[in-house]
Amino acid sequence: MSIENLHIADETEIPAGATVELHSRPERKARKALEGLGLKRVQGIQRVTLRRARNVLLVVSSPEVYKSPGSDCYIVFGEAKVEDPNSAAQLQAQAQLAASSQAAQQAHAHGGFKEGVPKSLEELMQDAPSADSSAPAPSGEATDASASGDFKVSDEEIQLIVAQTGVDEAKAREAYISEKGDLINAIMKLQ
């Protein structure tokens, strides 16, 4: 038997599929020092959030949490990451805007949004009423169009604002009109 074929079973060998947590030396020392305090491990905690000044959050995902039996003192082990809720809201709004614009482009590529929506400028010009004839419009849609300026208030967009913010339709419509038809700004205004 040669040296190359010799396999010595190491006691620290980890079997495949096992989950083992490797700790740094300072963390091992801290854990050993805390063992003597009689701390009890708290199960079922998935995330710990610590709020700092200027609305900055320190977030520990999948932490190990221990509680001191004599007081309300908790010790948290894990990797803390800085999270800014303002930037998270902006990123979420940008992602939502990108998704909605992509959906609009796909709908336009498939021939329009709804039945009766003109697919081209020529069709729109053919369907346009002449400047001489001014027939009265239905009362419900006319008030929305006149109050909102040049854009059309869509019930689908109002329902989207209601779903995203949880406010009633009147507040959603008011925010949508005050933001001049900008869906993202209306949602951000109500949150």
Curated annotation (Swiss-Prot):
<dbReference type="GO" id="GO:0051082">
    <property type="term" value="F:unfolded protein binding"/>
</dbReference>
<dbReference type="GO" id="GO:0015031">
    <property type="term" value="P:protein transport"/>
</dbReference>
<comment type="subunit">
    <text>Part of the nascent polypeptide-associated complex (NAC), consisting of EGD2 and EGD1. NAC associates with ribosomes via EGD1.</text>
</comment>
<protein>
    <recommendedName>
        <fullName>Nascent polypeptide-associated complex subunit alpha</fullName>
    </recommendedName>
</protein>
<comment type="similarity">
    <text>Belongs to the NAC-alpha family.</text>
</comment>
<dbReference type="Pfam" id="PF01849">
    <property type="entry name" value="NAC"/>
</dbReference>
<keyword id="KW-0813">Transport</keyword>
<dbReference type="Pfam" id="PF19026">
    <property type="entry name" value="UBA_HYPK"/>
</dbReference>
<keyword id="KW-0539">Nucleus</keyword>
<dbReference type="GO" id="GO:0006613">
    <property type="term" value="P:cotranslational protein targeting to membrane"/>
</dbReference>
<dbReference type="InterPro" id="IPR016641">
    <property type="entry name" value="EGD2/NACA0like"/>
</dbReference>
<dbReference type="GO" id="GO:0032266">
    <property type="term" value="F:phosphatidylinositol-3-phosphate binding"/>
</dbReference>
<keyword id="KW-0653">Protein transport</keyword>
<feature type="domain" description="NAC-A/B">
    <location>
        <begin position="24"/>
        <end position="89"/>
    </location>
</feature>
<dbReference type="GO" id="GO:0070273">
    <property type="term" value="F:phosphatidylinositol-4-phosphate binding"/>
</dbReference>
<dbReference type="GO" id="GO:0005854">
    <property type="term" value="C:nascent polypeptide-associated complex"/>
</dbReference>
<dbReference type="GO" id="GO:0070300">
    <property type="term" value="F:phosphatidic acid binding"/>
</dbReference>
<dbReference type="InterPro" id="IPR038187">
    <property type="entry name" value="NAC_A/B_dom_sf"/>
</dbReference>
<feature type="compositionally biased region" description="Low complexity">
    <location>
        <begin position="127"/>
        <end position="139"/>
    </location>
</feature>
<feature type="region of interest" description="Disordered">
    <location>
        <begin position="126"/>
        <end position="149"/>
    </location>
</feature>
<dbReference type="InterPro" id="IPR002715">
    <property type="entry name" value="Nas_poly-pep-assoc_cplx_dom"/>
</dbReference>
<dbReference type="GO" id="GO:0005634">
    <property type="term" value="C:nucleus"/>
</dbReference>
<feature type="domain" description="UBA">
    <location>
        <begin position="153"/>
        <end position="191"/>
    </location>
</feature>
<dbReference type="GO" id="GO:0080025">
    <property type="term" value="F:phosphatidylinositol-3,5-bisphosphate binding"/>
</dbReference>
<keyword id="KW-0963">Cytoplasm</keyword>
<dbReference type="InterPro" id="IPR044034">
    <property type="entry name" value="NAC-like_UBA"/>
</dbReference>
<comment type="function">
    <text>Component of the nascent polypeptide-associated complex (NAC), a dynamic component of the ribosomal exit tunnel, protecting the emerging polypeptides from interaction with other cytoplasmic proteins to ensure appropriate nascent protein targeting. The NAC complex also promotes mitochondrial protein import by enhancing productive ribosome interactions with the outer mitochondrial membrane and blocks the inappropriate interaction of ribosomes translating non-secretory nascent polypeptides with translocation sites in the membrane of the endoplasmic reticulum.</text>
</comment>
